[in-house]
C-alpha cells in the first residue's frame, strides 16, 4: 500500500497502528491502550486528588498563622509591624509569583510546576522551622506563598485538563473542598500545639507531609494532554488521553476531544493580553467588574478574620493561647460545613443569589460583633505586644499612682508595695494621645482606663477597677465570627470563582483570571498588613464596622453589576456582556422592563398579532 493511503487508514485491529489525520500534516501514532478497556477512571481520580493537595496546602498555610502568631510574638518578641510582616510575607510571595507564574506554566507544564512548587513549599517550611529569627521566618513564608499561589493555579488547570468534560465542575469543587479542609487542619494543629513549648514548629512542619507526598507521586502521573498539544507533541497527547479515558463510557471519542482542544487553543491565540484593556466587546468593563468583585471580597475583612482569628478572640475574652486557638478552630469546622452545601446549591439557586444571601449574613454578623467589642471595652485594648511596650515586672495596687516615662526599658520599675490583690500591670501601649493599659488579675487579662499624656512625655497613671469581659459577650462574639465565616463560605469563598469563569470568553479567560488573581493577592496583602496598625489607630470596633459597611457595598455591587449565570450558557452570558449598552442597560433594567410591559413596541404588537 502506498504511504499516502496508509497515512489516513483507520483500523480496529488491536495489534495494528493508528494514524490520525491533522489538518496540516499526517502524524504517525502508536497504538496505546484502548479507550474501551483499562482503568482511566482510577487514573483521573488519582491525578486530580494528588494535584488538589495544593488546595490542602493553601488552606493549611493560610490558617495556621492565626494560632502560631500568638507563640511567635512571644518567642521572637515581635512588634506590631513585625507581626503584620510575618502575616503579609506569604501574601507578598503569592503576589510576586502570580505576576510571572503563567510563563512557568506555559513553558514547563502543569505537572512539572506542581512538583516544583511542592519542593518550594518544603524549602520554605524548613527555613521557617530550623532558623529561629524574624527574617528567616519572613523569607520562609514568602517561599511558601510563592508555592501555594502558583500550585493553586497549576493544580486547577491540571485537574480540568485531565478530567472528562462532565467531571470538570466536580473536580474544581474538590479543590475548593481541599482548601477548607486544609484550613480546618491548620486551625486544629495550631490548637493542638498551642500549649507545647515551641509548638509553632510542629504546626509549621505539618505542611511537609502533603508537600513531600505530592512531589513524590506527581512524576508517576500523566501530563496534561492540552499542554502536550501546545508543545506540538501530538503523539504523546493522543497516548495520554487514551490512558485517561480508558474504560470511561460517558466520554466522547479521543479524536473528537483532541479536535475540540485544538479549536479552543486556536480561539485563545486570537486574543492578546492587551485586549483585556480595550473597549472591544466591553472587555475592559468585564475586567473592572472582576477586579472590583475580588477587591470587595477582601475588603469585607475575610483575610484578617482568618489570619488574626486567635488574636481577635483573645481580645474579647478568650485568654490564653490554648483558649483563643481552640475557639478559632471552630472557623475551620464552619468553613467545611458552609462550602459543602454551596457545591450542591450553586446549580439550583445560582451564584448571584448565594452571593447576596451570604454577604447579607456577613454584614449583619460584623455589625453585631462591632457593637459587642464596644460594649466589652476592646476599643481600648491593644492587639499587639512587643518589646517596646511591655513591663511585666511592674506591680501596683488598685488606686496607686506612679509616673511612667515613655520608652521605659523592660523591668526598670520594681514592685513598690507588697502585692495585696494580685493585680499587676502587664502592658502599656503608647498611641501618641493616650496610654492604653492592660493588667492581669488572677491570670485573667482585663482593661484599664486610658490616661492622657503630658507634654513631658510622662503620665500620672491611676490604676482603676478591673473591667472583666462578661461571659455572655465573649460567647456572642465567637458566635458572630462563626456566622460571618459561614456566610463567607457559602458565598464569596466558592462563588467568586464561578462568576469570574463566566464573565470572560474562552479565548481570553486564562489571561483575565491571571490578572485578577494578581490583583486579588495584592489586595489581600494590603488589607492583612494594615489590620493591626488600624486597630491601634482607630480601634477594633471601628475596623469591624468598616467590614460591615463594605459588605453592604458588595451586596449592592452584586445586584447591579454581576450578571445572572443560572441556567445560561457561557455563550449567552458573553453575548450579553459584549453589548455596548450593557452597563447602562443593567442600571436601568427594572425601568425598561416596566416600560416594556406598559407600552409594548410596534414589533411586539406585530408579533403578537401573528
From Swiss-Prot:
* Matches recorded under Pfam families: Sugar_tr
Q: Where in the cell is it found?
A: Cell membrane; Endomembrane system; Cytoplasm, Perinuclear region
PROSITE patterns noted in UniProt = MFS, SUGAR_TRANSPORT_1
Indicate which residues are glycosylated according to the record.
Answer: 392, 429, 438
Q: Which reaction does it catalyse?
A: D-glucose(out) = D-glucose(in)
Q: Where, by tissue, is this protein expressed?
A: Expressed in the main insulin-sensitive tissues, such as cardiac muscle, skeletal muscle and adipose tissue.
Keywords for this protein:
Cell membrane, Cytoplasm, Glycoprotein, Membrane, Sugar transport, Transmembrane, Transmembrane helix, Transport
**Is DNA-binding one of the keywords UniProt gives this record?**
no
The UniProt entry's sequence similarity note says: Belongs to the major facilitator superfamily. Sugar transporter (TC 2.A.1.1) family. Glucose transporter subfamily.
Its recorded name reads Solute carrier family 2, facilitated glucose transporter member 12
Q: Which organism is it from?
A: Danio rerio
Task: State the gene name recorded for this protein.
Answer: slc2a12
